[in-house]
Amino acid sequence: IGNIGTISEVVVRKEERRLYLLSGERVVRDYRISLGKTPEGHKLYEGDSRTPEGSYTLDFRNPNSDFYKSIRISYPSAKDRELAEAWGLSPGGNIMIHGLPNNVGDMAFAYKGLDWTDGCIAVTNEEMDEIWQLVDVGTPIRILP
């Protein structure tokens, strides 16, 4: 992977379908991503298939998820919970950065360029290996429209 320094922040630009790894102010890696099936707008409630927008933290790593590795985003925040509960809804949770479904087999190509998740941020398995290696728990993530 080379000497790229410590990853200080992850930035997602939903409109561009890009995830950037930053070391200080410098972008050291960027990836094409897939989002939730309803990509526009902030996640409001469980089941809306949206990817949240805002500032969060990467707070947990799961090597044994239903998808190829996953790193959890600290959604919902207190504000997210308050917003959903005002409508009498659950904000949802378990929003992750992850690879492809574990059972995808030869169909991996079918996911490329599509927004197919329930709100998570997906990359290829090879890219997930790299992100897994470079990004520590506690790293801030900003998800922009």
What role is predicted for each listed range?
Residues 60-145:
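Exported/periplasmic cell-wall-interacting domains
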Residues 30-32, 55, 94, 140:
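Well-ordered beta-strand positions in beta-sheet-rich domains
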Residues 6, 27, 52, 65-67, ...:
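A short, polar/charged loop/turn motif at coil->beta-strand junctions and beta-hairpin connectors
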